[in-house]
Protein backbone atom coordinates (compact mmCIF):
# COMPACT_ATOMS: atom_id res chain seq x y z
CA UNK A 1 0.00 0.00 0.00
CA UNK A 2 1.14 3.51 -0.83
CA UNK A 3 -0.19 6.68 0.78
CA UNK A 4 0.08 10.41 0.22
CA UNK A 5 -1.00 13.29 2.45
CA UNK A 6 -1.50 16.99 1.94
CA UNK A 7 -1.89 19.43 4.84
CA UNK A 8 -4.77 21.91 4.57
CA UNK A 9 -5.09 25.30 6.26
CA UNK A 10 -8.04 24.33 8.49
CA UNK A 11 -6.45 21.66 10.71
CA UNK A 12 -7.35 18.92 8.22
CA UNK A 13 -5.26 16.64 6.01
CA UNK A 14 -6.11 15.07 2.64
CA UNK A 15 -5.04 11.44 2.52
CA UNK A 16 -4.94 9.10 -0.46
CA UNK A 17 -4.44 5.34 -0.09
CA UNK A 18 -3.49 3.22 -3.09
CA UNK A 19 -3.83 -0.55 -2.75
CA UNK A 20 -2.49 -3.06 -5.22
CA UNK A 21 -4.71 -5.83 -6.54
CA UNK A 22 -2.83 -8.33 -4.36
CA UNK A 23 -3.68 -6.26 -1.24
CA UNK A 24 -7.34 -6.37 -2.18
CA UNK A 25 -7.19 -10.12 -2.78
CA UNK A 26 -5.74 -10.68 0.70
CA UNK A 27 -8.51 -8.55 2.23
CA UNK A 28 -11.14 -10.64 0.44
CA UNK A 29 -9.49 -13.85 1.71
CA UNK A 30 -9.49 -12.49 5.27
CA UNK A 31 -13.16 -11.53 4.99
CA UNK A 32 -14.14 -14.93 3.54
CA UNK A 33 -12.34 -16.64 6.43
CA UNK A 34 -14.30 -14.54 8.94
CA UNK A 35 -17.61 -15.30 7.22
CA UNK A 36 -16.76 -19.02 7.08
CA UNK A 37 -17.08 -19.26 10.87
CA UNK A 38 -20.83 -18.63 10.84
CA UNK A 39 -22.15 -19.09 7.31
CA UNK A 40 -24.73 -21.78 6.65
CA UNK A 41 -24.54 -23.53 3.26
CA UNK A 42 -26.95 -26.36 2.33
CA UNK A 43 -25.35 -29.73 2.99
CA UNK A 44 -23.00 -28.43 5.68
CA UNK A 45 -23.33 -27.65 9.36
CA UNK A 46 -23.04 -23.90 10.20
CA UNK A 47 -19.39 -22.83 10.00
CA UNK A 48 -18.20 -26.14 8.50
CA UNK A 49 -18.38 -25.37 4.76
CA UNK A 50 -15.00 -25.44 2.92
CA UNK A 51 -13.44 -22.05 2.26
CA UNK A 52 -13.50 -22.41 -1.55
CA UNK A 53 -17.22 -23.15 -1.39
CA UNK A 54 -17.73 -20.09 0.87
CA UNK A 55 -15.93 -17.96 -1.74
CA UNK A 56 -18.14 -19.26 -4.56
CA UNK A 57 -21.27 -18.82 -2.45
CA UNK A 58 -20.54 -15.24 -1.34
CA UNK A 59 -18.61 -13.98 -4.35
CA UNK A 60 -18.45 -10.19 -4.57
CA UNK A 61 -21.13 -9.62 -1.91
CA UNK A 62 -18.43 -9.20 0.71
CA UNK A 63 -16.72 -6.40 -1.24
CA UNK A 64 -17.85 -3.70 1.23
CA UNK A 65 -16.55 -5.65 4.24
CA UNK A 66 -13.32 -6.55 2.45
CA UNK A 67 -12.62 -2.96 1.42
CA UNK A 68 -13.36 -1.77 4.95
CA UNK A 69 -10.91 -4.37 6.32
CA UNK A 70 -8.36 -3.27 3.74
CA UNK A 71 -8.62 0.40 4.77
CA UNK A 72 -8.65 -0.24 8.53
CA UNK A 73 -5.62 -2.54 8.36
CA UNK A 74 -3.84 -0.18 5.99
CA UNK A 75 -4.40 2.83 8.24
CA UNK A 76 -3.28 0.87 11.30
CA UNK A 77 0.04 0.23 9.58
CA UNK A 78 0.76 3.94 8.96
CA UNK A 79 -0.83 5.76 11.93
CA UNK A 80 2.47 6.21 13.74
CA UNK A 81 4.17 7.37 10.53
CA UNK A 82 1.77 10.23 9.77
CA UNK A 83 3.44 13.63 9.96
CA UNK A 84 0.18 15.17 11.17
CA UNK A 85 -1.52 12.92 13.78
CA UNK A 86 -5.10 11.83 13.18
CA UNK A 87 -7.54 12.75 15.97
CA UNK A 88 -10.40 10.58 14.67
CA UNK A 89 -10.89 8.00 11.93
CA UNK A 90 -12.39 9.63 8.82
CA UNK A 91 -14.94 8.35 6.33
CA UNK A 92 -13.19 7.13 3.18
CA UNK A 93 -14.49 7.37 -0.34
CA UNK A 94 -13.63 4.70 -2.90
CA UNK A 95 -12.57 6.32 -6.16
CA UNK A 96 -12.96 3.29 -8.42
CA UNK A 97 -13.52 -0.30 -7.42
CA UNK A 98 -12.95 -3.00 -10.01
CA UNK A 99 -12.20 -6.60 -8.98
CA UNK A 100 -8.64 -7.59 -9.77
CA UNK A 101 -7.39 -4.02 -10.14
CA UNK A 102 -5.74 -1.44 -7.89
CA UNK A 103 -8.02 0.39 -5.47
CA UNK A 104 -7.81 4.05 -4.46
CA UNK A 105 -9.44 5.41 -1.28
CA UNK A 106 -9.43 9.07 -0.25
CA UNK A 107 -10.48 10.95 2.87
CA UNK A 108 -10.03 14.18 4.78
CA UNK A 109 -9.05 13.67 8.40
CA UNK A 110 -8.84 16.11 11.27
CA UNK A 111 -5.54 16.71 12.99
CA UNK A 112 -4.55 18.42 16.24
CA UNK A 113 -5.49 22.08 16.79
CA UNK A 114 -2.85 24.52 15.60
CA UNK A 115 -1.81 27.15 18.13
CA UNK A 116 0.51 30.04 17.39
CA UNK A 117 1.00 31.56 20.82
CA UNK A 118 1.40 35.29 21.11
CA UNK A 119 3.41 37.21 23.68
CA UNK A 120 2.82 35.97 27.21
CA UNK A 121 5.98 36.97 29.05
CA UNK A 122 6.56 40.44 30.45
CA UNK A 123 2.92 41.46 30.07
CA UNK A 124 2.48 44.56 32.23
CA UNK A 125 -0.10 44.28 34.99
CA UNK A 126 -1.15 46.87 37.56
CA UNK A 127 -2.06 45.41 40.93
CA UNK A 128 -3.70 47.17 43.87
CA UNK A 129 -2.53 46.37 47.38
CA UNK A 130 -5.12 44.91 49.73
CA UNK A 131 -5.48 46.91 52.94
CA UNK A 132 -7.24 45.16 55.83
CA UNK A 133 -8.68 47.58 58.39
CA UNK A 134 -9.76 47.07 61.99
CA UNK A 135 -13.33 47.51 60.75
CA UNK A 136 -12.90 44.54 58.38
CA UNK A 137 -11.67 42.41 61.26
CA UNK A 138 -14.60 43.58 63.41
CA UNK A 139 -17.04 42.46 60.68
CA UNK A 140 -15.42 39.02 60.58
CA UNK A 141 -15.57 38.76 64.37
CA UNK A 142 -19.29 39.60 64.20
CA UNK A 143 -19.80 36.79 61.68
CA UNK A 144 -18.01 34.42 64.04
CA UNK A 145 -20.25 35.53 66.91
CA UNK A 146 -23.31 34.75 64.79
CA UNK A 147 -21.91 31.30 63.98
CA UNK A 148 -21.39 30.57 67.68
CA UNK A 149 -24.62 32.18 68.87
CA UNK A 150 -27.10 30.22 70.98
CA UNK A 151 -30.81 30.73 71.25
CA UNK A 152 -32.77 31.12 74.48
CA UNK A 153 -36.53 31.11 74.96
CA UNK A 154 -37.97 34.53 75.60
CA UNK A 155 -39.92 35.09 78.76
CA UNK A 156 -43.71 35.00 78.79
CA UNK A 157 -45.23 38.22 77.53
CA UNK A 158 -42.25 39.23 75.43
CA UNK A 159 -42.83 39.80 71.72
CA UNK A 160 -40.91 39.27 68.49
CA UNK A 161 -38.36 41.84 67.34
CA UNK A 162 -35.66 42.06 64.70
CA UNK A 163 -32.80 39.69 65.53
CA UNK A 164 -35.05 37.16 67.28
CA UNK A 165 -35.60 33.57 66.14
CA UNK A 166 -39.09 32.10 65.80
CA UNK A 167 -40.76 28.77 65.15
CA UNK A 168 -44.02 29.24 63.25
CA UNK A 169 -46.85 27.47 61.49
CA UNK A 170 -48.35 29.11 58.44
CA UNK A 171 -50.58 28.71 55.42
CA UNK A 172 -50.06 30.60 52.19
CA UNK A 173 -51.99 30.94 48.96
CA UNK A 174 -52.20 33.34 46.06
CA UNK A 175 -54.77 36.05 46.62
CA UNK A 176 -58.17 34.85 45.47
CA UNK A 177 -57.12 31.17 45.47
CA UNK A 178 -57.73 28.34 47.93
CA UNK A 179 -54.74 27.03 49.95
CA UNK A 180 -53.32 23.93 48.24
CA UNK A 181 -51.65 22.42 51.31
CA UNK A 182 -52.26 22.11 55.02
CA UNK A 183 -50.26 24.31 57.35
CA UNK A 184 -46.50 24.43 56.95
CA UNK A 185 -43.85 24.65 59.66
CA UNK A 186 -40.77 26.86 59.68
CA UNK A 187 -38.33 26.51 62.55
CA UNK A 188 -35.37 28.75 63.39
CA UNK A 189 -36.60 31.60 61.22
CA UNK A 190 -34.29 34.58 61.85
CA UNK A 191 -36.25 37.83 61.92
CA UNK A 192 -34.53 40.73 60.21
CA UNK A 193 -32.05 38.59 58.27
CA UNK A 194 -30.77 40.31 55.12
CA UNK A 195 -31.87 37.39 52.92
CA UNK A 196 -35.49 37.46 54.08
CA UNK A 197 -38.24 38.82 51.85
CA UNK A 198 -38.16 42.60 52.03
CA UNK A 199 -41.12 43.89 54.03
CA UNK A 200 -42.23 40.44 55.19
CA UNK A 201 -40.78 40.34 58.71
CA UNK A 202 -42.41 43.63 59.70
CA UNK A 203 -45.73 41.76 59.77
CA UNK A 204 -44.41 39.52 62.55
CA UNK A 205 -42.86 42.10 64.85
CA UNK A 206 -44.79 42.53 68.10
CA UNK A 207 -46.34 39.05 68.05
CA UNK A 208 -46.04 36.73 71.05
CA UNK A 209 -46.15 32.95 71.42
CA UNK A 210 -49.59 31.66 70.39
CA UNK A 211 -50.49 34.83 68.49
CA UNK A 212 -51.94 34.40 64.99
CA UNK A 213 -51.89 37.00 62.26
CA UNK A 214 -53.25 37.15 58.72
CA UNK A 215 -51.68 39.49 56.18
CA UNK A 216 -50.86 39.91 52.49
CA UNK A 217 -47.46 40.24 50.87
CA UNK A 218 -46.72 41.27 47.28
CA UNK A 219 -43.56 40.01 45.62
CA UNK A 220 -41.49 42.53 43.62
CA UNK A 221 -41.94 42.60 39.83
CA UNK A 222 -38.24 41.77 39.37
CA UNK A 223 -38.25 38.85 41.83
CA UNK A 224 -35.93 36.04 40.72
CA UNK A 225 -38.65 33.37 40.75
CA UNK A 226 -40.82 34.40 37.81
CA UNK A 227 -43.79 32.29 38.91
CA UNK A 228 -44.39 34.54 41.94
CA UNK A 229 -42.96 37.87 40.72
CA UNK A 230 -45.48 40.69 41.03
CA UNK A 231 -48.12 38.45 42.63
CA UNK A 232 -49.84 38.94 45.99
CA UNK A 233 -50.05 36.08 48.49
CA UNK A 234 -52.13 35.79 51.66
CA UNK A 235 -50.49 34.41 54.80
CA UNK A 236 -51.83 33.12 58.08
CA UNK A 237 -49.02 32.81 60.65
CA UNK A 238 -49.07 31.40 64.19
CA UNK A 239 -46.04 31.89 66.46
CA UNK A 240 -45.16 28.56 68.14
CA UNK A 241 -41.92 29.55 69.91
CA UNK A 242 -39.91 32.72 70.35
CA UNK A 243 -36.18 32.91 71.06
CA UNK A 244 -33.65 35.62 71.70
CA UNK A 245 -30.36 35.14 69.85
CA UNK A 246 -27.50 35.39 72.36
CA UNK A 247 -24.13 36.30 70.86
CA UNK A 248 -20.96 35.32 72.76
CA UNK A 249 -18.73 37.98 74.29
CA UNK A 250 -15.74 39.08 72.23
CA UNK A 251 -12.87 37.72 74.32
CA UNK A 252 -10.22 35.00 74.47
CA UNK A 253 -12.89 32.36 75.12
CA UNK A 254 -14.53 33.24 71.79
CA UNK A 255 -11.21 32.73 69.99
CA UNK A 256 -10.63 29.39 71.71
CA UNK A 257 -14.14 28.14 70.93
CA UNK A 258 -13.93 29.17 67.27
CA UNK A 259 -10.66 27.60 66.16
CA UNK A 260 -8.58 26.92 69.26
CA UNK A 261 -6.65 30.21 69.13
CA UNK A 262 -4.83 30.96 72.39
CA UNK A 263 -6.09 34.55 72.48
CA UNK A 264 -8.36 37.05 70.77
CA UNK A 265 -5.34 38.90 69.36
CA UNK A 266 -4.07 35.67 67.79
CA UNK A 267 -7.47 35.15 66.14
CA UNK A 268 -7.46 38.72 64.84
CA UNK A 269 -3.99 38.20 63.33
CA UNK A 270 -5.25 35.06 61.58
CA UNK A 271 -8.28 36.92 60.27
CA UNK A 272 -6.12 39.76 58.93
CA UNK A 273 -3.79 37.29 57.19
CA UNK A 274 -6.66 35.21 55.74
CA UNK A 275 -8.55 38.28 54.47
CA UNK A 276 -5.44 39.63 52.78
CA UNK A 277 -4.62 36.29 51.13
CA UNK A 278 -8.22 35.62 50.07
CA UNK A 279 -8.71 38.97 48.36
CA UNK A 280 -5.23 38.98 46.85
CA UNK A 281 -6.18 35.64 45.30
CA UNK A 282 -9.40 37.19 44.00
CA UNK A 283 -7.50 40.08 42.42
CA UNK A 284 -4.96 37.68 40.93
CA UNK A 285 -7.74 35.58 39.35
CA UNK A 286 -9.42 38.65 37.87
CA UNK A 287 -6.11 39.92 36.52
CA UNK A 288 -5.47 36.49 35.01
CA UNK A 289 -8.69 36.89 33.03
CA UNK A 290 -7.27 40.10 31.57
CA UNK A 291 -3.89 38.46 30.94
CA UNK A 292 -5.46 35.52 29.11
CA UNK A 293 -7.57 37.89 27.02
CA UNK A 294 -4.43 39.78 25.98
CA UNK A 295 -2.60 36.54 25.12
CA UNK A 296 -5.56 35.13 23.19
CA UNK A 297 -6.02 38.35 21.22
CA UNK A 298 -2.35 38.12 20.21
CA UNK A 299 -2.48 34.40 19.31
CA UNK A 300 -3.77 32.39 16.36
CA UNK A 301 -5.91 29.28 16.67
CA UNK A 302 -7.13 26.73 14.14
CA UNK A 303 -9.52 24.13 15.54
CA UNK A 304 -11.01 21.14 13.71
CA UNK A 305 -14.76 21.58 13.29
CA UNK A 306 -15.46 18.50 15.42
CA UNK A 307 -13.63 20.08 18.39
CA UNK A 308 -15.80 23.18 18.28
CA UNK A 309 -19.01 21.22 17.65
CA UNK A 310 -18.41 18.83 20.55
CA UNK A 311 -17.39 21.63 22.93
CA UNK A 312 -20.45 23.64 21.88
CA UNK A 313 -22.69 20.68 22.77
CA UNK A 314 -20.79 20.28 26.05
CA UNK A 315 -21.34 23.95 26.97
CA UNK A 316 -25.03 23.69 26.07
CA UNK A 317 -25.66 20.56 28.14
CA UNK A 318 -23.71 22.03 31.08
CA UNK A 319 -26.02 25.04 31.00
CA UNK A 320 -29.10 22.79 30.88
CA UNK A 321 -27.79 20.87 33.90
CA UNK A 322 -26.76 24.01 35.84
CA UNK A 323 -30.16 25.67 35.48
CA UNK A 324 -32.00 22.37 36.06
CA UNK A 325 -33.83 22.65 32.74
CA UNK A 326 -35.51 19.61 31.16
CA UNK A 327 -33.30 17.62 28.79
CA UNK A 328 -33.97 19.30 25.45
CA UNK A 329 -32.23 19.80 22.13
CA UNK A 330 -30.72 23.09 21.07
CA UNK A 331 -33.54 23.43 18.52
CA UNK A 332 -36.19 23.21 21.25
CA UNK A 333 -34.20 25.53 23.48
CA UNK A 334 -34.11 28.14 20.69
CA UNK A 335 -37.90 27.92 20.37
CA UNK A 336 -38.29 28.15 24.15
CA UNK A 337 -36.35 31.43 24.34
CA UNK A 338 -37.89 32.63 21.06
CA UNK A 339 -34.62 33.07 19.19
CA UNK A 340 -33.39 31.95 15.79
CA UNK A 341 -31.61 28.58 15.91
CA UNK A 342 -28.61 29.89 13.97
CA UNK A 343 -28.23 32.74 16.48
CA UNK A 344 -28.31 30.30 19.40
CA UNK A 345 -25.86 27.94 17.69
CA UNK A 346 -23.49 30.82 16.98
CA UNK A 347 -23.71 31.94 20.61
CA UNK A 348 -22.71 28.51 21.94
CA UNK A 349 -20.07 28.16 19.23
CA UNK A 350 -18.45 31.41 20.40
CA UNK A 351 -18.49 30.19 24.01
CA UNK A 352 -16.99 26.88 22.91
CA UNK A 353 -14.21 28.54 20.92
CA UNK A 354 -13.37 30.77 23.89
CA UNK A 355 -13.13 27.75 26.22
CA UNK A 356 -10.96 25.90 23.73
CA UNK A 357 -8.68 28.91 23.35
CA UNK A 358 -8.20 29.13 27.12
CA UNK A 359 -7.58 25.38 27.43
CA UNK A 360 -5.04 25.13 24.61
CA UNK A 361 -3.32 28.37 25.64
CA UNK A 362 -2.68 26.82 29.05
CA UNK A 363 -1.50 23.60 27.41
CA UNK A 364 0.91 25.49 25.17
CA UNK A 365 2.32 27.56 28.05
CA UNK A 366 2.72 24.40 30.15
CA UNK A 367 4.59 22.77 27.26
CA UNK A 368 6.93 25.74 26.70
CA UNK A 369 7.55 26.39 30.40
CA UNK A 370 7.83 22.68 31.20
CA UNK A 371 5.05 22.79 33.81
CA UNK A 372 4.36 19.28 35.06
CA UNK A 373 1.81 17.91 37.49
CA UNK A 374 2.57 14.66 39.28
CA UNK A 375 0.49 12.34 41.43
CA UNK A 376 2.43 13.71 44.41
CA UNK A 377 1.25 17.22 43.47
CA UNK A 378 -2.30 15.92 43.14
CA UNK A 379 -2.24 14.25 46.56
CA UNK A 380 -0.88 17.44 48.14
CA UNK A 381 -3.66 19.54 46.59
CA UNK A 382 -6.31 17.04 47.66
CA UNK A 383 -4.86 17.08 51.19
CA UNK A 384 -5.26 20.87 51.32
CA UNK A 385 -8.81 20.59 50.03
CA UNK A 386 -9.71 17.90 52.55
CA UNK A 387 -8.23 20.05 55.32
CA UNK A 388 -10.34 23.04 54.26
CA UNK A 389 -13.46 20.83 54.41
CA UNK A 390 -12.24 19.36 57.72
CA UNK A 391 -12.66 15.80 56.46
CA UNK A 392 -10.16 12.92 56.09
CA UNK A 393 -8.35 12.70 52.75
CA UNK A 394 -9.64 9.15 52.26
CA UNK A 395 -13.25 10.39 52.54
CA UNK A 396 -12.66 13.12 49.97
CA UNK A 397 -11.07 10.67 47.53
CA UNK A 398 -13.96 8.26 48.01
CA UNK A 399 -16.50 10.98 47.20
CA UNK A 400 -14.57 12.14 44.12
CA UNK A 401 -14.21 8.59 42.83
CA UNK A 402 -17.89 7.92 43.47
CA UNK A 403 -18.82 10.99 41.43
CA UNK A 404 -16.18 10.22 38.77
CA UNK A 405 -14.62 13.62 39.44
CA UNK A 406 -10.96 12.70 39.97
CA UNK A 407 -9.87 13.59 36.43
CA UNK A 408 -11.80 16.86 36.55
CA UNK A 409 -10.14 17.89 39.81
CA UNK A 410 -6.73 16.86 38.49
CA UNK A 411 -7.25 19.06 35.41
CA UNK A 412 -8.44 21.98 37.55
CA UNK A 413 -5.43 21.77 39.86
CA UNK A 414 -3.08 21.54 36.88
CA UNK A 415 -4.72 24.60 35.28
CA UNK A 416 -4.22 26.48 38.55
CA UNK A 417 -0.53 25.56 38.58
CA UNK A 418 -0.13 26.83 35.00
CA UNK A 419 -1.93 30.05 35.97
CA UNK A 420 0.47 30.60 38.87
CA UNK A 421 3.41 30.03 36.52
CA UNK A 422 1.99 32.54 34.04
CA UNK A 423 1.34 35.10 36.77
CA UNK A 424 4.96 34.82 37.90
CA UNK A 425 6.08 35.68 34.35
CA UNK A 426 4.18 38.97 34.02
CA UNK A 427 5.58 42.35 35.06
CA UNK A 428 3.65 43.47 38.13
CA UNK A 429 3.40 47.07 39.25
CA UNK A 430 1.74 47.70 42.60
CA UNK A 431 -0.40 50.82 42.69
CA UNK A 432 -2.75 52.31 45.27
CA UNK A 433 -4.13 50.51 48.29
CA UNK A 434 -7.74 49.31 48.27
CA UNK A 435 -9.90 48.54 51.27
CA UNK A 436 -11.73 45.22 51.44
CA UNK A 437 -14.94 47.00 50.40
CA UNK A 438 -13.24 48.52 47.36
CA UNK A 439 -11.75 45.16 46.40
CA UNK A 440 -15.22 43.57 46.61
CA UNK A 441 -16.59 46.26 44.29
CA UNK A 442 -13.71 45.69 41.88
CA UNK A 443 -14.17 41.92 41.85
CA UNK A 444 -17.91 42.28 41.23
CA UNK A 445 -17.39 44.42 38.15
CA UNK A 446 -17.93 42.50 34.92
CA UNK A 447 -16.12 44.92 32.67
CA UNK A 448 -12.34 45.12 32.68
CA UNK A 449 -11.08 47.86 34.96
CA UNK A 450 -7.52 49.09 35.30
CA UNK A 451 -6.63 49.91 38.87
Curated annotation (Swiss-Prot):
InterPro entries in alphabetical order: PPIase_dom_sf, PPIase_FKBP_dom, Trig_fac, Trigger_fac_C, Trigger_fac_C_sf, Trigger_fac_ribosome-bd_bac, Trigger_fac_ribosome-bd_sf, Trigger_fact/SurA_dom_sf
Claim: Transmembrane is one of the keywords in the record: no
Transmembrane intervals: none
Primary location: cytoplasm
GO MF: peptidyl-prolyl cis-trans isomerase activity; protein folding chaperone; ribosome binding
Class in the EC hierarchy, top level: isomerase
Compartment list: Cytoplasm
Recorded catalytic activity of this chain's protein: [protein]-peptidylproline (omega=180) = [protein]-peptidylproline (omega=0)
Biological processes per GO annotation: 'de novo' cotranslational protein folding; cell division; chaperone-mediated protein folding; protein transport; protein unfolding
Alphabetized Gene3D superfamilies for the sequence: 3.10.50.40, Trigger factor ribosome-binding domain (3.30.70.1050), Trigger factor, C-terminal domain (1.10.3120.10)
Cysteine-cysteine disulfides: none
EC id: 5.2.1.8
Superkingdom, taxonomy of origin: Bacteria
PPIase FKBP-type domain: residues covered: 163-248
Record keywords, A-Z: Cell cycle, Cell division, Chaperone, Cytoplasm, Isomerase, Rotamase
GO CC annotations on file: cytoplasm
PANTHER family hit by this protein: TRIGGER FACTOR CHAPERONE AND PEPTIDYL-PROLYL CIS/TRANS ISOMERASE, TRIGGER FACTOR-LIKE PROTEIN TIG, CHLOROPLASTIC
Function: Involved in protein export. Acts as a chaperone by maintaining the newly synthesized protein in an open conformation. Functions as a peptidyl-prolyl cis-trans isomerase.
UniProt family annotation: Belongs to the FKBP-type PPIase family. Tig subfamily.
Record-linked NCBIfam families: tig
Record text about domains: Consists of 3 domains; the N-terminus binds the ribosome, the middle domain has PPIase activity, while the C-terminus has intrinsic chaperone activity on its own.
Protein name per its UniProtKB record: Trigger factor
